Amino acid sequence: MSGHSKWATTKHKKAANDAKRGKEFAKLIKNIEVAARTGGGDPSANPTLDDMIKKAKKASVPNDNIERARKRGSGEEAGGADWMNIMYEGYGPNGVAMLIECLTDNRNRAATEVRTAMTKNGGNLGESGSVSYMFTRTGVVTVQKGDLSEDDVLMAVLEAGAEEVNDNGDLFEVTCAPTDIQAVRDALVEAGIEVEDSESDFRASVQVPLDADGARKIFKLVDALEDSDDVQNVYTNIDLSDEVLTELEND
């Protein structure tokens, strides 16, 4: 499997179609509110908030919605919810390990919706720690290629704690420890390189190879999970060959 696509299927993301756009907007707004509450409402002093706002704008979330979420999170405006981060663990079809990251104001609702989606699509929830040992939290910072070479990016981040620079097609992806994300961002900015995105991700240490039919079952389960407003991200340890990816693209 080629390096640039290896992780593209690790965290399966929804297609931005009209049917799911409303749910995606709600999740982006929620992230802005939480980021503002955690690190303050000034995007220039809160890189996480700045990233969340950029993601929302890229997804065409109205500016008014973005601003209200920022104010709710920072306390400038009343009405913010009491959000909780919860991580569920389990297995999908073919023994695929899954981490389901939720951001919710109702623990019981989140648990019920995750369990229902898993059960109806060939998965099952496990105990805490049942699959998380297979995953490592990783910092990921991405930049647009433009005229940059891989060496340009590597030289900029070498002293900032970067572990790898991967070629992901139109983007370069810099991986690092989650605690080094800000240092890597700062190093890129100092080198005149614009940061596209930065986040903490989960990378699996052991992958499960799947054929196209197996991948379709996992994607169906992931879509069912992400239909819940409480589910923010789903991470799996699937490994898809270039041949399987090509077959899936032709679906």
UniProtKB/Swiss-Prot annotation:
Tree of life domain: Bacteria
Residue segments, region Disordered: 1-22
GO cellular component: cytosol
GO molecular function, one term: DNA binding
InterPro entries with a match to the protein in the record: Integrase-like_N (IPR017856), TACO1_YebC-like_2nd/3rd_dom (IPR048300), TACO1_YebC_N (IPR049083), Transcrip_reg_TACO1-like (IPR002876), Transcrip_reg_TACO1-like_dom3 (IPR026564), YebC-like (IPR029072)
Biological process according to GO: regulation of DNA-templated transcription
Annotated compartments: Cytoplasm
UniProt keywords, alphabetically: Cytoplasm, DNA-binding, Transcription, Transcription regulation
Family (UniProt): Belongs to the TACO1 family.
Record HAMAP family: Transcrip_reg_TACO1
Protein name (record): Probable transcriptional regulatory protein Cgl1663/cg1872
